[in-house]
Amino acid sequence: MFSIIFIALLILLITTIVMFLASILSKKALIDREKSSPFECGFDPKSSSRLPFSLRFFLITIIFLIFDVEIALILPMIIIMKYSNIMIWTITSIIFILILLIGLYHEWNQGMLNWSN
């Protein structure tokens, strides 16, 4: 038990030292606006290099990722059904699906699924 804690603390210490050294060694000495710009030659740009970003696409992407992870969590529940107690499995599944439906209702109620706004 003591050796496991010692190894964990040693790993934590080593990673902390490596991260500290990396942050010190990676800092730039002189910050110049032209050199920090996305252009390679260092001249002043005529227009902004930032492209407009649609917040709707971002929200739809986040919602898709959330529901994609939920599907990845539901699929193993089907396989586990025959190995577990049916009552506990049913209660767990109902609670999980209820949480999903509450989240979907909240997104719908907030207008995140309405593309026209």
Swiss-Prot record:
Q: Which reaction does it catalyse?
A: a ubiquinone + NADH + 5 H(+)(in) = a ubiquinol + NAD(+) + 4 H(+)(out)
Task: Name where it mostly resides.
Answer: mitochondrion
- InterPro entries tied to this protein: NADH_UbQ/plastoQ_OxRdtase_su3, NDAH_ubi_oxred_su3_sf
Which Pfam families does the annotation name? Answer: Oxidored_q4
Provide this UniProt record's keywords sorted from A to Z: Electron transport, Membrane, Mitochondrion, NAD, Respiratory chain, Translocase, Transmembrane, Transmembrane helix, Transport, Ubiquinone
Q: Which Gene3D superfamilies match?
A: NADH:ubiquinone/plastoquinone oxidoreductase, chain 3 (1.20.58.1610)
The UniProt transmembrane annotation reads: 4-24, 60-80, 86-106
Q: Which GO terms describe its molecular function?
A: NADH dehydrogenase (ubiquinone) activity
| Gene Ontology BP annotations | mitochondrial electron transport, NADH to ubiquinone
Give the EC number(s) under which this enzyme is classified.
Answer: 7.1.1.2
Question: Localized where?
Answer: Mitochondrion membrane
Tell me the domain of life: Eukaryota
Listed GO CC annotations: mitochondrial inner membrane; respiratory chain complex I
State the annotated membrane topology for this chain: Multi-pass membrane protein
The entry assigns this protein to a family as follows: Belongs to the complex I subunit 3 family.
State the protein's purpose: Core subunit of the mitochondrial membrane respiratory chain NADH dehydrogenase (Complex I) that is believed to belong to the minimal assembly required for catalysis. Complex I functions in the transfer of electrons from NADH to the respiratory chain. The immediate electron acceptor for the enzyme is believed to be ubiquinone.
**Protein's recorded name:** NADH-ubiquinone oxidoreductase chain 3
Q: Which gene encodes it?
A: mt:ND3
